[in-house]
């Protein structure tokens, strides 16, 4: 999402997208705040993985989920599957000493098995406000025993966010942004409110063009036309990557303000 990098910096973007991290300690424990042995970690959640690398602890990771595609080194790690369709066997197959688990991961039965295992897990609540960005960095840092580095990173991101807020305060009217998660077979799945994408749009000074629902849903042509986005933001990497040329084959998107101006960012 290069538009975010230009507005608030890569650090802020990764933190906004971060969901929560949870480590389950003993056999019947739910979560812990700090992992004693961080030598072999599994990270589930793209932003959590980015934070780990930003803290200089990427060498501790042995596996990641499919949403963890940045930085490039992360893609070389063992892939344990999509964060919402994890299998306990896949996660535990790499013999982790700790699991960084984003809130929203699942399914529930997998989480129950992981919590009953002897591998520590830590859960960080998923939120997308400026305040929660800083809290997530600090919580990941605490989980890894890297509090000082986390404090420094949080300070950098805080400055980026303040800069972004100053920039966005001068934007009038604010750009209407449509985040498209996928466009498989011409069917547009886009972000409503209550998502990491919505949080990024807001922090970057934009307005989500879709505010009629929470989460991700398929849009009708009428809904796309009504959204009238000034900017279309899409996935640039991974299995859900969407190409600009493919989007412009959709006549409704092509005729939108973003389509007419070619204002499509991956």
Tell where the protein language model's regions lie, with residue ranges.
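Bacterial N-terminal signal peptides that target proteins for export
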Residues: 2-15
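Sec/Tat signal peptide C-region and signal peptidase I cleavage site
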Residues: 23-29
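Extracytoplasmic substrate-binding proteins
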Residues: 34-40, 109-185, 210-212, 262-266
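A short, structured surface patch at a secondary-structure boundary
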Residues: 40-94, 98-105
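Short secondary-structure boundary segments
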Residues: 45, 103-104, 126, 213, ...
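His/Asp/Glu-enriched short active-site or ligand-binding loop at hydrolase and phosphoryl-transfer sites
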Residues: 65, 191-216, 236, 261
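Short helices/loops that flank or line small-molecule/ion binding pockets
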Residues: 88-95, 220-228
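A ligand-binding cleft/hinge motif common to bilobed small-molecule-binding domains
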Residues: 105-116, 234-250
């Amino acid at each position: 999402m290069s538009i975010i990098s230009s507005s608030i910096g890569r650090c802020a973007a990764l933190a906004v997208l971060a969901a929560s991290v949870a480590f389950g300690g003993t056999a019947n424990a739910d979560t812990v705040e700090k992992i004693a042995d961080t030598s072999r970690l599994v990270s589930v959640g793209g932003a959590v993985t980015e934070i780990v690398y930003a803290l200089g602890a990427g060498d501790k990771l042995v596996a990641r989920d499919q949403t963890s595609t940045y930085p490039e080194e992360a893609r070389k790690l063992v892939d344990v599957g999509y964060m919402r369709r994890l299998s306990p066997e896949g996660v535990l197959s790499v013999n982790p000493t700790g699991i960084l688990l984003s809130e929203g991961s699942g399914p529930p039965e997998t989480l129950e098995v992981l919590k009953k295992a002897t591998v520590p897990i830590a859960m960080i609540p998923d939120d997308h406000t400026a305040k929660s960005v800083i809290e997530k960095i600090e919580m990941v840092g605490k989980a890894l025993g890297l509090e000082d580095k986390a404090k420094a990173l949080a300070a950098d991101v805080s400055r980026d966010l303040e800069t972004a807020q100053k920039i966005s305060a001068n934007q009038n009217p604010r750009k209407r942004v449509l985040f498209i998660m996928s466009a498989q077979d011409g069917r547009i799945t886009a972000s409503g409110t209550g998502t990491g994408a919505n949080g990024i749009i807001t922090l970057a000074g934009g307005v989500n063009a879709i505010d009629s629902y929470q989460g991700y849903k398929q849009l009708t042509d009428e809904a796309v036309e009504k959204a009238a986005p000034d900017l279309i933001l899409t996935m640039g990497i991974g299995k859900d990557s969407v190409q600009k040329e493919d989007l412009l084959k959709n006549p409704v998107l092509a005729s939108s303000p973003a389509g007419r101006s070619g204002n499509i960012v991956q």
